[in-house]
């Protein structure tokens, strides 16, 4: 915790002047006095927001340099006449004393003003330090509370994890015991299978021994018989394949003839059905057919007329545009000699002045 600077009490101008009358060093040692280091211990920073502020506060430490004021006190006589006589006798000394007193008063006032400014600065610095310390304490309290809450949460989580781990360990132990029992059963079953396989291997070994003797004596005769039977079987397959090809060709031809007959019967039946269904509506159908033919002829004629009109359209458009350019108001046509409508004169047109010339009289 930093030491809080106490605000000094004002006891008037007289007490301040008395304090400055007794300097703790001689005047010529004033320039040689070294700046005292800060007596405030560094404040531990709670967060990064107060870093620059605290550095400034700990770095700025005011150093008071007061010019000592000397008040010349002389033995004042008790008799006013004697005092009046002395003043009359030494006016130069009196002026010097007055000037010295005025100078001391001015320096005292300047020192008082400086002291007040220093006091204001120190009080402001004190308030800022108090606010900073309070903010640091608040932030530290919040941080400690958050850490305590986090510790409580972590303790709860650790308890839950320990309980779940114990429960999981018991479950794994029971599963391991079951797995060991299953493995024992499986091992006994595998041992039985191994015994059975050993018996089969012995039996197979006996068969192999028998086959080895068979291969040495009867295999050559049996192989010749098998090759002859394979050739006979291949010949039978070839003959059967030829017969199957002939049979497939015959089947295809029979199916084609049957399909042709079926199609002819279908067409005949459909034509008879169509004729029977169209018989009551034959006249109307003929009429519709003739009307459709006439309609097609009319459409063809109309298409030819439309094509002809489309060919004549550009010529007619040109004629209409020409007529529109030639049309004028009836007023201008009737009163042409009165209105005297002439074309406008543009800047690039040649101006022709048609001024009538006075002809000389014949007499």
UniProtKB/Swiss-Prot annotation:
Highest taxon in the source lineage: Eukaryota
Identify the keywords attached in UniProt to this record, alphabetized: Coiled coil
* Coiled-coil segments on the chain, per record: 109-329
Record-linked Pfam families: DUF4618 (PF15397)
**What is the protein named?**
Uncharacterized protein C20orf96
């Amino acid at each position: 915790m930093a030491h809080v600077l106490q605000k000094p009490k004002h006891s008037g101008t007289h007490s301040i002047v008395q304090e400055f009358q007794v300097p703790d060093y001689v005047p010529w040692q004033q320039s040689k006095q070294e700046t005292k280091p800060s007596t405030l211990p560094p404040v531990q920073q709670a967060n990064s927001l107060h870093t620059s502020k605290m550095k400034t506060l700990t770095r700025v430490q005011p150093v008071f340099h007061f010019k000592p004021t000397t008040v010349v006190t002389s033995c004042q006589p008790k008799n006013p006449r004697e005092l009046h006589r002395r003043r009359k006798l030494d006016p130069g000394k009196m002026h010097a004393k007055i000037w010295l007193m005025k100078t001391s008063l001015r320096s005292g006032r300047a020192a008082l003003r400086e002291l007040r400014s220093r006091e204001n600065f120190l009080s402001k610095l004190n308030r800022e330090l108090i606010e900073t310390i309070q903010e640091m304490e608040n932030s530290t309290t919040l941080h400690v509370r958050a850490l305590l809450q986090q510790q409580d949460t972590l303790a709860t989580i650790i308890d839950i994890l320990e309980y779940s781990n114990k429960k999981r360990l018991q479950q794994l132990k029971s599963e391991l015991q079951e797995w060991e029992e299953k493995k024992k059963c499986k091992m006994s079953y595998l041992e039985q299978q191994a015994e059975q396989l050993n018996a089969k291997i012995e039996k197979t070994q006996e068969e192999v021994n028998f086959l080895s003797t068979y291969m040495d004596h009867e295999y050559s005769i049996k192989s010749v018989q098998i090759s002859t039977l394979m050739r006979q079987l291949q010949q039978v397959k070839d003959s059967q394949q030829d017969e199957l090809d002939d049979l497939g060709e015959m089947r295809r031809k029979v199916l084609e003839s049957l399909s042709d007959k079926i199609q002819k019967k279908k067409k005949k039946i459909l034509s008879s059905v169509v004729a029977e269904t169209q018989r009551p509506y034959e006249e109307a159908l003929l009429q519709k057919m003739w009307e459709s033919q006439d309609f097609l002829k009319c459409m063809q004629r109309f298409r030819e007329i439309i094509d002809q009109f489309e060919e004549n359209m550009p010529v007619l458009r040109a004629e209409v545009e020409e007529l529109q350019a030639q049309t004028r108001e009836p007023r201008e046509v009737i009163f042409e000699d009165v209105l005297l409508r002439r074309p406008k004169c543009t800047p690039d047109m040649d101006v022709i002045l048609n001024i009538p010339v006075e002809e000389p009289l014949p007499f």
